[in-house]
């Protein structure tokens, strides 16, 4: 188990991207020694950055090994295919060919800091929450979500592209957040997270930390049943010198 834990930890990022004009926040906490959640920041050859949040079905050694394969294969496909949707389509084909009896939900945002465009590709995951600087909230790419990865080998994934204006935020998360249970066996729910993100915070870090604190307060003295992962990306508000 320690080996699987070490393998998994090796595939999680040790630092956040240093992209001028952007802030990042991430939180990862497995429910047990080895979790099935995965997130990553992948610098692409053309200056863009891919942000991935995924949830491998299951826990334990097999899930950790599958996550290792997912991580390596995602990096390979993104390095060799510039189109995010095509890269995920190829990633799915490769994972489906493994014929392992598990699948993975994944959402990816490819951020271009030159154009401030964010291209979202969704494979059966919760859509990111997008909060505009004005406080409006939506879930881009929800209607374009495809099947989870590794179920069928001939799925074509569709991209959704939005422009991040100054002050805009994207929040990506796994179902350990919205399905967190309180003592009455009630789920935290996406609506609570939406409301919290919509209210905003002084900084991206504060938003991330207050979101996790709210989920933890909901769980109370109960048990965290599932891995929890939250990743936030924010375009800074431009200040005039």
Describe each model-derived feature in a short phrase.
Residues 160-172, 177-241:
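C-terminal catalytic subdomain
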Residues 1-171, 220-241:
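… and, occasionally, acidic/histidine-rich disordered N-termini of signaling adaptors
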